[in-house]
Amino acid sequence: MGKAAAPSRGGGCGGRSRGLSSLFTVVPCLSCHTAAPGMSASTSGSGPEPKPQPQPVPEPERGPLSEQVSEAVSEAVPRSEPVSETTSEPEPGAGQPSELLQGSRPGSESSSGVGAGPFTKAASEPLSRAVGSATFLRPESGSLPALKPLPLLRPGQAKTPLGVPMSGTGTTSSAPLALLPLDSFEGWLLKWTNYLKGYQRRWFVLGNGLLSYYRNQGEMAHTCRGTINLSTAHIDTEDSCGILLTSGARSYHLKASSEVDRQQWITALELAKAKAVRVMNTHSDDSGDDDEATTPADKSELHHTLKNLSLKLDDLSTCNDLIAKHGAALQRSLTELDGLKIPSESGEKLKVVNERATLFRITSNAMINACRDFLELAEIHSRKWQRALQYEQEQRVHLEETIEQLAKQHNSLERAFHSAPGRPANPSKSFIEGSLLTPKGEDSEEDEDTEYFDAMEDSTSFITVITEAKEDSRKAEGSTGTSSVDWSSADNVLDGASLVPKGSSKVKRRVRIPNKPNYSLNLWSIMKNCIGRELSRIPMPVNFNEPLSMLQRLTEDLEYHHLLDKAVHCTSSVEQMCLVAAFSVSSYSTTVHRIAKPFNPMLGETFELDRLDDMGLRSLCEQVSHHPPSAAHYVFSKHGWSLWQEITISSKFRGKYISIMPLGAIHLEFQASGNHYVWRKSTSTVHNIIVGKLWIDQSGDIEIVNHKTNDRCQLKFLPYSYFSKEAARKVTGVVSDSQGKAHYVLSGSWDEQMECSKVMHSSPSSPSSDGKQKTVYQTLSAKLLWKKYPLPENAENMYYFSELALTLNEHEEGVAPTDSRLRPDQRLMEKGRWDEANTEKQRLEEKQRLSRRRRLEACGPGSSCSSEEEKEADAYTPLWFEKRLDPLTGEMACVYKGGYWEAKEKQDWHMCPNIF
């Protein structure tokens, strides 16, 4: 390389031209008038800076590639912060020329070469031992830091765009925090493990909407101790240094070392959660539409792409050789011309040719060197990426084998528990559907990192003490408030609420369906490629379905409609709230054994339930959206109430379980009183996906609000825990008025019954050992609100359908041509012809894809839609519902616009699309 003058202390670009020095060596820097590589200049502290003088430029010299590219790091260790060390070397001063440095050469002092260049200077000592034997060079005063080539990290290691480990609790960063990705973070946190070891130090990594933790940084490449998805997690704070993350039945109790670290983590977690929710909403889809699972064809395409890239790299190498060959031939020809005797009149022309040839030689040499550098780097990184890809493939296979092996161990432990002596007499009460034993061993992570919660943590936030009605008659008289009903009266509207006899229908309904065939199918072979994905986008055979659609499942929630019929006659709004709460819980009673998924409705599919004669209601559902899949529902009762909702079901496979999250508000209005109730559904979780007996759990909080009186009911679905003293599937709640005064306490289980107890007096309890304080409610004896109907005979062979569910898919005359009863694949499955049902299901899905493409094409380029989801929403208009702004929730929701029952009466279905 040519020599370069160092910039003055007063400023200068300090290496701005460095990136082009290997291509064009005569480039002055116009912004600060300093000389770029290939020029000489002297600087002065006070006098004017001299103009750059051109220098003869030799052919660029290149050091060995091994000195320019650092070796891969063999272990993921944190790098210490670069510490600037003081040296005794004098820096360039006023009137004194700076030290001139040569380019990197083999054998020179700076031949270690990592980051060496025309504006760098060898430091007196290595910066850090954390990156192997590579030495970092200190830049001169007033110049930018020397560029440091970044070693290739192993798969699983994280790095910021600046090449600095991401800061977190307990780490130090040499880059400002503002430059780091805001939704990515890593560092040390204290995590609650168990009561024996308390909080333990763990390395946490936040990225891609997932929070994972390891015992140390060395485990990042091979062993993840746990992961929580932030898109479904709730972030809460306990104290000045605490963070609580809850997702379904999983909770992380974390502590930071300081308030600053805690705030940084909370900010990063909230940003990552918001981004994950946006991604989840953007990528939700229906069954098997445009996102197929990884197939051998995909792998073949990947290898084909890699092969093409390799061929292109070979072509580039050949072109490089040709350029070098022809350049050498041209140089030889010019040398031969110089030796020839040429007449004097041709001397000027030959001089011009020589000048142009010299310029071409300089340019071509620089291009050849740059091309050679690129080829060598590309070959090195190509091999590294090939190894990384192979490593990831091996890790995936290893992960699949590990999960399958763990699932088998889990199943064997479950069987051992069932056959163990001294089992509870009533296994259903002890929740045997889940694994009640935890595998423990020397290598088990459960020894330290399994969360153990006591009863206080899983239990309710209040304590109930039952008192006698006679003893507290005076208190009851003064505390009834809005209640006008005597609790001990025989005609209390809440007494016997669940004992209402079922209505008798004039139409004889069926009481059984064909038995479920015994088809064996490996669920893991399908689910292993679906971790973290939206299940509605994954095509699955009907073997995992039940012969009902999601629209029919929504209608099945009306099985205990008599609770609402009875609530119409309540004169007290808080008593009415008790019945509404019992109705909201009763909708989960049918899910306890229903482990099969319903059919995803086709866009425009409908389902009606016309049972005015026996149930006194009419119900209509319509699939109103394809991206994301969403269903609108409207119910009218002749007893004086109406219910409507738009529900979007988001379901994802998390490796060990499936998480089902219903999104959307449910509205219930009583015409006589004008009371308007709004609530949302809880989260459902399906466990033991890979091996073992499937079981379902409900968890989360539900708040029911009466927007007329501002009465509220707080329901809590307690998730199942191995070590909880609470009963399985327990639900608790408190009904309070607009002033926050509690009137009723609710208790029960979502699969059996619900009771309510009238509150006579409430007082705070003494603080517990953990500092938490509960409210003590003195109540009267509990009254039964709702009790589950027994299942029909032989229900275990009929998908555990209830009496109402058995009638939902029964063929009826006069329904719309889009009704779920007319769906052919669902009908074939009900009859036990599953192979034909799978073939028909594929035909319907392909027909739906074709209709979707036509809608997107009809939207046109001139439309205001920016995404495919917006285009489809803009192109498709529901037939019986319309989008309106909900004034209570502030959300857009589909509400019934009328016309269906009139069309049915006339049997005029010309407006219905042909979807089957």
From Swiss-Prot:
Topology with respect to the bilayer: Peripheral membrane protein
InterPro entries reported in the protein's UniProt record: OSBP_sf, Oxysterol-bd, Oxysterol-bd_CS, PH-like_dom_sf, PH_domain
Molecular function GO labels: cholesterol binding
Segments forming a coiled coil: none
Keywords for this protein: Cytoplasmic vesicle, Differentiation, Lipid transport, Lipid-binding, Membrane, Phosphoprotein, Spermatogenesis, Transport
CDD domains: PH_OSBP_ORP4
Coarse class of the protein's main subcellular location: membrane
Tissue: Expressed mainly in retina, testis, and fetal liver.
Comp. bias intervals (Polar residues): 99-113
Chain residue ranges for the region called Disordered: 1-20, 34-121, 139-163, 282-301, 417-448, 813-842
Superkingdom, natural source: Eukaryota
Domain called PH: residue spans: 182-274
UniProt biased composition (Pro residues): 49-58
Compositionally biased tracts (Low complexity): 79-92, 144-155
GO biological process, one term: spermatid development
Phosphoserine PTM positions: S287, S763
Record GO cellular component, one term: acrosomal vesicle
Family under the similarity heading: Belongs to the OSBP family.
Function: Binds 7-ketocholesterol. Acts during spermatid development where its function is required prior to the removal of cytoplasm from the sperm head.
Protein name, as recorded: Oxysterol-binding protein 2
Lineage of origin: Eukaryota, Metazoa, Chordata, Craniata, Vertebrata
Underlying gene: OSBP2
